[in-house]
C-alpha cells in the first residue's frame, strides 16, 4: 500500500529533455509501484531504500520528457492512479512559485485554525488557474522552490525524551555528550514519520 506519493523533484533540463524524479513510499515488502508514462517520455527502473525507523520502502523513478514547442501536460499512471505534471515548451521560461515555513512551529497554533493548509490550497488553485493574483493568471506552475523551514520539527524537543534530557544538560556536558545509537534511531524514525505526515496531506 502506498504511504506517500507521488512527490516530484525537478532534476534539470538538458538537450531539451525535462527530468523529473518521482518519489513514492510503500509498505515494506510490497513490490515496486507500477509507473506508466506516455511515449516519448521514458522512465528508468526505480532505486529503492528502506525508510529509517519505519516499516516502509522509498522508491525513486527518474522520468525524461522531451520538450515540445508548446507547454505540454504529461498524464501518467502510478499504481493505477492517474496524475499529471506540466512541462514548459522549448526555450520558454518555466513558471515558478516560492514557499517557506511549511507547517507550524507550535502544533497548538494549528488547532485553532479551520483551514491549516489554506495557503497550500490557494497555491493549488493558482496552479490550476482557478485563482489569480491581481487579475493575472500564473498556472500551470512548473517548479516549486522551497526556502527555510521546509518542514517545522520543533516538537522533537518534547516528543523525544532522550533529546529533551540532552537539551537540559549544562552546556559543558551537552557539547561532550555522545550521540548515541538510540538517539540516532529515535531521530530517524521521528523525521521519517514527520515527512510522511506532512507530504501526504492533500
Residue ranges and their predicted role:
Residues 1-202:
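Extended recognition/assembly regions associated with phosphoester-bond processing machinery
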Amino acid at each position: 500500500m502506498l504511504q506517500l506519493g507521488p512527490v516530484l523533484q525537478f532534476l534539470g533540463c538538458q538537450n531539451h529533455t525535462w527530468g523529473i524524479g518521482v518519489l513514492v513510499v510503500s509498505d515494506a515488502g510490497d513490490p515496486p509501484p507500477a509507473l506508466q508514462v506516455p511515449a516519448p517520455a521514458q522512465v528508468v527502473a526505480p532505486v529503492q531504500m528502506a525508510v529509517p525507523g519505519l516499516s516502509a520502502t522509498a522508491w525513486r523513478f527518474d522520468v525524461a520528457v522531451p520538450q515540445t514547442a508548446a507547454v505540454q501536460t504529461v498524464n501518467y499512471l502510478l499504481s493505477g492512479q492517474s496524475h499529471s505534471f506540466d512541462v514548459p515548451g522549448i526555450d520558454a521560461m518555466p513558471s515558478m512559485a516560492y514557499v517557506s515555513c511549511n507547517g507550524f512551529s507550535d502544533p497548538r497554533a494549528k488547532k485553532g485554525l479551520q483551514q491549516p493548509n489554506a495557503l497550500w490550497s490557494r497555491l493549488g488553485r493558482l496552479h490550476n488557474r482557478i485563482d489569480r493574483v491581481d487579475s493575472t493568471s500564473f498556472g500551470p506552475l512548473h517548479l516549486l522552490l522551497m526556502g527555510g523551514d521546509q518542514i517545522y520539527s520543533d516538537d522533537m524537543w518534547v516528543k523525544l525524551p532522550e533529546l529533551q534530557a540532552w537539551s537540559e544538560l549544562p552546556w559543558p556536558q551537552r557539547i561532550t555528550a555522545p550521540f548515541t545509537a538510540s538517539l540516532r534511531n529515535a531521530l530517524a524514525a521521528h523525521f521519517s514519520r514527520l515527512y510522511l505526515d506532512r507530504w501526504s496531506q492533500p
